[in-house]
A protein has these predicted regions:
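Substrate-binding pocket helix/loop in short-chain dehydrogenase/reductase
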Residues: 63-64, 68-73, 177
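Short C-terminal tail/terminal secondary-structure segment
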Residues: 112, 197, 208-223
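The beta1-alpha1 cofactor-binding region of Rossmann-like NAD(H)/NADP(H)-dependent oxidoreductases
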Residues: 6-7, 27-39, 69, 190-191
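Conserved glycine-rich Rossmann-like NAD(P)H-binding loop of the short-chain dehydrogenase/reductase
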Residues: 1-11
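Alpha-helical segment proximal to the catalytic Tyr-Lys
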Residues: 92, 136-140, 205
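Residue(s) in the substrate-gating loop at a strand-loop-helix junction
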Residues: 107
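Active-site helix of classical SDR
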Residues: 87, 123, 131
Protein backbone atom coordinates (compact mmCIF):
# COMPACT_ATOMS: atom_id res chain seq x y z
CA UNK A 1 0.00 0.00 0.00
CA UNK A 2 1.46 3.35 -1.10
CA UNK A 3 0.32 6.72 0.22
CA UNK A 4 1.79 10.19 0.47
CA UNK A 5 0.74 9.98 4.15
CA UNK A 6 2.71 6.97 5.35
CA UNK A 7 1.08 7.04 8.79
CA UNK A 8 -2.40 6.86 7.28
CA UNK A 9 -1.31 3.98 5.06
CA UNK A 10 0.18 2.20 8.08
CA UNK A 11 -3.11 2.54 9.94
CA UNK A 12 -5.03 0.91 7.09
CA UNK A 13 -2.38 -1.79 6.72
CA UNK A 14 -2.72 -2.57 10.44
CA UNK A 15 -6.48 -2.90 10.05
CA UNK A 16 -6.01 -5.32 7.16
CA UNK A 17 -3.58 -7.43 9.18
CA UNK A 18 -5.91 -7.40 12.19
CA UNK A 19 -8.69 -8.71 9.93
CA UNK A 20 -6.50 -11.64 8.89
CA UNK A 21 -4.95 -10.25 5.72
CA UNK A 22 -1.42 -9.30 4.74
CA UNK A 23 -0.40 -5.71 4.13
CA UNK A 24 2.57 -3.37 4.31
CA UNK A 25 2.61 0.40 3.98
CA UNK A 26 5.13 2.64 2.24
CA UNK A 27 5.28 6.40 1.87
CA UNK A 28 5.12 7.54 -1.75
CA UNK A 29 4.30 10.71 -3.67
CA UNK A 30 3.00 9.26 -6.93
CA UNK A 31 3.54 12.59 -8.72
CA UNK A 32 7.31 12.23 -8.21
CA UNK A 33 8.99 9.55 -10.37
CA UNK A 34 11.88 9.05 -7.93
CA UNK A 35 9.50 8.55 -5.01
CA UNK A 36 7.63 5.92 -7.02
CA UNK A 37 10.87 4.23 -8.05
CA UNK A 38 12.07 3.97 -4.45
CA UNK A 39 8.69 2.72 -3.21
CA UNK A 40 8.42 0.04 -5.90
CA UNK A 41 11.98 -1.07 -5.17
CA UNK A 42 10.88 -1.74 -1.59
CA UNK A 43 7.69 -3.48 -2.71
CA UNK A 44 9.57 -5.76 -5.10
CA UNK A 45 11.76 -6.94 -2.23
CA UNK A 46 8.60 -8.63 -0.93
CA UNK A 47 7.85 -10.48 -4.17
CA UNK A 48 6.01 -10.03 -7.46
CA UNK A 49 3.62 -7.22 -8.31
CA UNK A 50 0.59 -8.97 -9.78
CA UNK A 51 -2.07 -6.29 -9.27
CA UNK A 52 -1.77 -2.49 -9.40
CA UNK A 53 -4.70 -0.33 -8.27
CA UNK A 54 -4.15 3.35 -9.07
CA UNK A 55 -6.39 5.22 -6.64
CA UNK A 56 -4.51 8.43 -5.76
CA UNK A 57 -6.31 11.59 -6.83
CA UNK A 58 -7.07 15.22 -6.06
CA UNK A 59 -9.65 17.72 -7.27
CA UNK A 60 -9.92 21.45 -7.93
CA UNK A 61 -12.96 23.75 -8.05
CA UNK A 62 -12.94 26.00 -11.09
CA UNK A 63 -14.01 26.31 -14.71
CA UNK A 64 -11.52 26.98 -17.53
CA UNK A 65 -11.02 30.64 -16.58
CA UNK A 66 -10.92 29.79 -12.88
CA UNK A 67 -8.11 27.28 -13.30
CA UNK A 68 -4.60 28.70 -13.19
CA UNK A 69 -1.66 26.92 -14.77
CA UNK A 70 -0.38 25.83 -11.32
CA UNK A 71 -3.88 24.47 -10.53
CA UNK A 72 -3.89 22.58 -13.82
CA UNK A 73 -0.38 21.21 -13.29
CA UNK A 74 -1.09 20.10 -9.72
CA UNK A 75 -4.17 18.08 -10.71
CA UNK A 76 -2.51 16.65 -13.81
CA UNK A 77 0.63 15.64 -11.89
CA UNK A 78 -1.28 13.59 -9.33
CA UNK A 79 -4.23 12.26 -11.32
CA UNK A 80 -2.51 11.53 -14.63
CA UNK A 81 1.25 11.55 -14.16
CA UNK A 82 0.85 9.68 -10.87
CA UNK A 83 -0.85 6.78 -12.64
CA UNK A 84 1.69 6.95 -15.44
CA UNK A 85 4.56 6.76 -12.94
CA UNK A 86 3.07 3.75 -11.15
CA UNK A 87 2.28 1.91 -14.37
CA UNK A 88 5.82 2.62 -15.62
CA UNK A 89 7.11 0.94 -12.47
CA UNK A 90 4.72 -2.02 -12.40
CA UNK A 91 3.92 -2.98 -16.00
CA UNK A 92 7.45 -3.99 -17.09
CA UNK A 93 7.63 -6.23 -14.02
CA UNK A 94 4.24 -7.77 -14.85
CA UNK A 95 5.32 -8.23 -18.46
CA UNK A 96 8.47 -10.07 -17.39
CA UNK A 97 6.52 -12.33 -15.05
CA UNK A 98 3.74 -13.55 -17.29
CA UNK A 99 1.02 -10.97 -16.80
CA UNK A 100 -0.90 -8.95 -14.26
CA UNK A 101 -3.82 -6.65 -13.61
CA UNK A 102 -3.99 -2.84 -13.65
CA UNK A 103 -7.05 -1.06 -12.32
CA UNK A 104 -7.28 2.72 -12.63
CA UNK A 105 -9.71 4.92 -10.73
CA UNK A 106 -11.35 7.30 -13.20
CA UNK A 107 -14.63 9.19 -12.71
CA UNK A 108 -17.90 9.95 -14.45
CA UNK A 109 -16.28 13.40 -14.87
CA UNK A 110 -13.97 11.82 -17.43
CA UNK A 111 -16.94 10.73 -19.53
CA UNK A 112 -19.41 13.58 -19.15
CA UNK A 113 -17.38 16.45 -17.72
CA UNK A 114 -18.49 18.27 -14.59
CA UNK A 115 -19.29 21.96 -14.22
CA UNK A 116 -16.63 23.89 -12.27
CA UNK A 117 -14.30 20.89 -12.35
CA UNK A 118 -12.33 21.65 -15.52
CA UNK A 119 -8.94 20.28 -14.44
CA UNK A 120 -10.43 17.28 -12.66
CA UNK A 121 -12.65 16.34 -15.61
CA UNK A 122 -9.71 16.70 -17.99
CA UNK A 123 -7.52 14.50 -15.83
CA UNK A 124 -10.08 11.73 -15.49
CA UNK A 125 -10.72 11.74 -19.24
CA UNK A 126 -6.99 11.13 -19.63
CA UNK A 127 -7.20 8.22 -17.18
CA UNK A 128 -9.87 6.55 -19.30
CA UNK A 129 -7.78 7.02 -22.46
CA UNK A 130 -4.64 5.68 -20.75
CA UNK A 131 -6.59 2.64 -19.63
CA UNK A 132 -7.73 1.81 -23.16
CA UNK A 133 -4.24 2.33 -24.57
CA UNK A 134 -2.49 0.15 -21.97
CA UNK A 135 -5.13 -2.56 -22.38
CA UNK A 136 -4.47 -2.67 -26.13
CA UNK A 137 -0.69 -2.49 -25.90
CA UNK A 138 -0.28 -5.23 -23.31
CA UNK A 139 -3.05 -7.67 -24.18
CA UNK A 140 -0.53 -10.05 -25.73
CA UNK A 141 1.45 -9.96 -22.48
CA UNK A 142 -1.56 -11.13 -20.44
CA UNK A 143 -1.92 -7.80 -18.66
CA UNK A 144 -5.53 -6.75 -18.14
CA UNK A 145 -6.25 -3.04 -17.68
CA UNK A 146 -9.64 -1.59 -16.72
CA UNK A 147 -10.93 1.50 -14.99
CA UNK A 148 -13.80 2.35 -12.68
CA UNK A 149 -15.73 5.61 -13.05
CA UNK A 150 -17.59 6.39 -9.84
CA UNK A 151 -19.99 9.23 -9.35
CA UNK A 152 -19.79 10.97 -5.98
CA UNK A 153 -18.61 8.73 -3.14
CA UNK A 154 -18.99 9.72 0.51
CA UNK A 155 -15.45 9.59 1.88
CA UNK A 156 -13.35 11.78 4.20
CA UNK A 157 -12.03 13.34 0.97
CA UNK A 158 -15.54 14.70 0.26
CA UNK A 159 -16.00 15.95 3.82
CA UNK A 160 -12.64 17.75 3.70
CA UNK A 161 -13.42 19.17 0.27
CA UNK A 162 -16.70 20.64 1.53
CA UNK A 163 -15.03 22.13 4.62
CA UNK A 164 -12.33 23.82 2.54
CA UNK A 165 -14.52 25.13 -0.26
CA UNK A 166 -17.90 25.75 1.42
CA UNK A 167 -17.16 26.78 5.03
CA UNK A 168 -20.37 27.09 7.03
CA UNK A 169 -22.39 25.48 4.25
CA UNK A 170 -21.04 21.94 4.44
CA UNK A 171 -24.35 20.27 5.30
CA UNK A 172 -26.26 22.23 2.68
CA UNK A 173 -23.76 21.28 -0.01
CA UNK A 174 -23.66 17.66 1.19
CA UNK A 175 -27.44 17.41 0.76
CA UNK A 176 -27.19 18.97 -2.71
CA UNK A 177 -24.60 16.39 -3.69
CA UNK A 178 -26.83 13.59 -2.43
CA UNK A 179 -29.84 14.93 -4.35
CA UNK A 180 -27.80 15.27 -7.55
CA UNK A 181 -27.66 11.48 -7.73
CA UNK A 182 -30.72 9.87 -9.39
CA UNK A 183 -30.52 7.09 -6.79
CA UNK A 184 -30.82 9.71 -4.04
CA UNK A 185 -27.49 9.27 -2.26
CA UNK A 186 -23.76 9.13 -2.75
CA UNK A 187 -22.01 5.80 -3.14
CA UNK A 188 -20.43 4.05 -0.18
CA UNK A 189 -16.69 3.31 -0.44
CA UNK A 190 -17.47 -0.38 0.03
CA UNK A 191 -19.56 -0.38 -3.15
CA UNK A 192 -16.61 0.86 -5.19
CA UNK A 193 -14.29 -1.58 -3.42
CA UNK A 194 -16.56 -4.52 -4.25
CA UNK A 195 -16.34 -3.73 -7.97
CA UNK A 196 -12.58 -3.25 -7.70
CA UNK A 197 -12.21 -6.63 -6.01
CA UNK A 198 -14.22 -8.28 -8.78
CA UNK A 199 -12.18 -6.68 -11.58
CA UNK A 200 -8.96 -7.82 -9.89
CA UNK A 201 -10.21 -11.39 -9.48
CA UNK A 202 -10.13 -14.48 -11.66
CA UNK A 203 -13.88 -14.10 -12.16
CA UNK A 204 -13.06 -11.07 -14.34
CA UNK A 205 -10.35 -12.81 -16.36
CA UNK A 206 -12.21 -12.14 -19.64
CA UNK A 207 -12.57 -8.40 -18.96
CA UNK A 208 -10.04 -5.84 -20.19
CA UNK A 209 -10.09 -2.43 -21.84
CA UNK A 210 -13.36 -1.51 -20.13
CA UNK A 211 -14.53 1.58 -18.26
CA UNK A 212 -17.07 0.68 -15.58
CA UNK A 213 -19.42 3.47 -14.44
CA UNK A 214 -20.69 2.95 -10.90
CA UNK A 215 -22.76 6.07 -10.61
CA UNK A 216 -26.25 5.50 -9.21
CA UNK A 217 -27.71 6.32 -12.62
CA UNK A 218 -25.86 9.65 -12.95
CA UNK A 219 -24.91 9.26 -16.61
CA UNK A 220 -28.09 7.73 -17.99
CA UNK A 221 -31.01 8.40 -15.64
CA UNK A 222 -30.94 12.11 -14.90
CA UNK A 223 -34.10 13.81 -16.12
Amino acid sequence: MLDIDENAAATVASEIVAAGGNAKAYGCDVAQPESVRVAFHKVLQEGRVQILVNNAGISHVGNLEGTTEPDFDRVFCVNVKGMYNCMQAAVPHMKANGGGIVLNMASIAGTSGLADRFAYSMSKGAVVAMTYSVAKDYLAHKIRCNCISPARVHTPFVDGFLRRNYPGKEQEMFEKLEKSQPIGRMAKPEEIADLAMFLCSEEASFITGTNYPIDGGFLNLRG
